[in-house]
Amino acid sequence: MPVALTEEQTALAAAVRDWAAAHDPVAAVRAAETTGAGLPEGFAALGLTGVALPASVNGADGTVADLAAGLAAAAEALVPGPLLSTALAGLLLAEHSKELAAEIADGTAHVAVQLDEEAVPGADAGSWLLVPRGERYVLVPPGAAVEPLAPFDFSRSLGRVKADVPGEVLDLPDVRDLAATLAVAEAAGVARWCLTTAVEYAKVREQFGQVIGAFQAVKHLCAEMLCRTEAAEALAWDAASAVGDPLAVASAAAVALDAAVENAKDCIQVLGGIGFTWEHEAHLYLRRALALRQWLGGSQRWRKRAADLALAGKRRTLGVNVGEDAEVTRLVAEIAALPEENRRTALADSGLLAPHWPQPYGRGADAAEQLRIDAALTAADIKRPDMVIGGWAVPTILAHGTDEQRERFAAPTLRGEVTWCQLFSEPGAGSDLASLRTAARRTDGGWLLTGQKVWTSLAHEADWAICLARTDPDVPKHKGITYFLVDMRAAGITTRPLREITGRSVFNEVFLDDVFVPDADVVGEPGAGWKLARTTLANERVALGRGSAVGENVEELLESAPEDVDRDRLGALIGQGSACSVLDLRATLRRLDGLGPGAESSVAKLLGVRHRQETAEFALDLASELVAETPAAQEFLLTRCLSIAGGTTQVLLSAAAERVLGLPR
């Protein structure tokens, strides 16, 4: 999902793209190889530098988030010139120099902003300058002594500013944070162009008789680029929306600056030889990404800043204001007054336990109502019980089962009277469910199931199982599969616990030896099990975490981190955790707008798994002793399953490349 979310932001980004399509900004960048390019003629008419400035200085009275959306689109098109620094200066000077701010808004003035390096992007003889002097900044009019330099990034001029240039001294707080807020939007735009370019090339470039996008290695490169792009865009949007929040911008810069650089490098890799040529523009985007990162002092600086802020107690929470529901508030208050042991039944009977389920078992709640219910439960300190596999099984029964099956299983599952396991995976069919071999043959009044299932969580204590078995071996493998409900106490079932690397036994292998399943326990039509299984795997409610934006696992790290903790590594985890939280938020906003899951959903598991595994490993590294039963050791071992269960990371990378990016199978 791009940085632009609102209709206004989307329209602004589209206007920038339309302008770029008509004016070929890349050609202007190429033409300025030795001098660096200025803002192209005619671009000022778009008014981008004045988008977030007040009407009192001829601005558009928009937000910094609006400006970020435009900057991301401009960077995606490689619009040259000091657009970023001029827009930054406009925000900084709107209350200090209204005349100059008005010139910035109408595009007649451009400004270069110095942060650390003597070489200043955008500085030339005609530019205004903002240069640091101690804790303050000096505003220098055009004509100051600026030594022109040959820029690494051709899309902007580069100049060395003479020390102690005279000018107006100003108190400008948070210059660097505001600069980073806008720069990460540009970084997100660069990352998006690199992803798009690599994917489009992979769809048409042929090698060994097929397009290279069909090769797993290329798919995984592109899928990793997708993950970086989505994280960068989400964090750029968040930093701009929460402008002034130092942890938001530090987290964004910790992730997005590197995302742009890594995507540019991987884009060249996918392009191969053509990507290494001067004629292809990929290197121009790599130059822009590297220049952005250097201008802000490198991403390590921002990882350390994120860690410093978090260790000092700075926190953020993310949320969506969907209002309150008086009836829900009343119901929740009544449930909160009950003894703990009675609350689950009350939640189930009121429809609050699974509000997204249809009535009478749920409330048929839309996304907004689900969030209002969650907020009310959180405020009352009521934790919703986890139905585990029941939360997947029952929605399939509700959608495809009989009235008798719904009556028999839905309410008892909600109340905790029936627990479930899932008999899907087999020794030869893990993620590839269509290859399962468990057979079901017809008998009087039902079916006899024979086969072996594995990796079945909680099978040793579950009451019922949802089970896939092959009822017709003579049709293509995705067909001929039927969806059964299996009583785990039935004759012919043998359950054997599997000891995991944690030393515990949660997984099991289950042997089925002529297990009788009556026709009344078949869900849907025989042979339609594949479609129903996909329904099971897709069922999820709308939810939004209400804790710290950096994530629960990072919070535990922060509580126990020693004074000499590796702040670069900690800051990276804070950035990752923030990315996961913001992706979750943006996915929720999509659902509130009535849209289906976007790329965020595909990316969220990939990033979330990696984040939790790396956080667990860091916690283990911080442990004073490597003792087997410590929480850190157990969590590290447990998290190794996350990149396997529910689809391995490698399978999910391929799926993201095919289903989100459109690369061929």
Question: Model-flagged regions — what are they?
Answer:
Residues 29, 106-116, 131, 416-424, ...:
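A short, Trp-centered hydrophobic/proline-enriched beta-strand micro-motif
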Residues 112-158, 398, 450-496:
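A short core secondary-structure module
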Residues 188, 195, 208-313, 631:
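Extended, hydrophobic interaction surfaces within ordered domains
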Residues 2, 88, 274-337, 368, ...:
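Glycine-rich phosphate/cofactor-binding loops in nucleotide/flavin-utilizing enzymes
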Residues 2, 25-34, 226-255, 269-271, ...:
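C-terminal helix-coil-helix/basic helical segment that borders enzyme active sites and/or dimer interfaces
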Residues 2-14, 18, 146-230, 319-323, ...:
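Glycine-rich beta->alpha junctions and the first turn(s) of the following alpha-helix
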Residues 44-101, 352-411, 415-416, 458, ...:
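Internal helix-loop-helix
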Residues 1-77, 301-388, 398, 408, ...:
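Amphipathic, small/basic residue-rich leader segments at the start of a protein or domain
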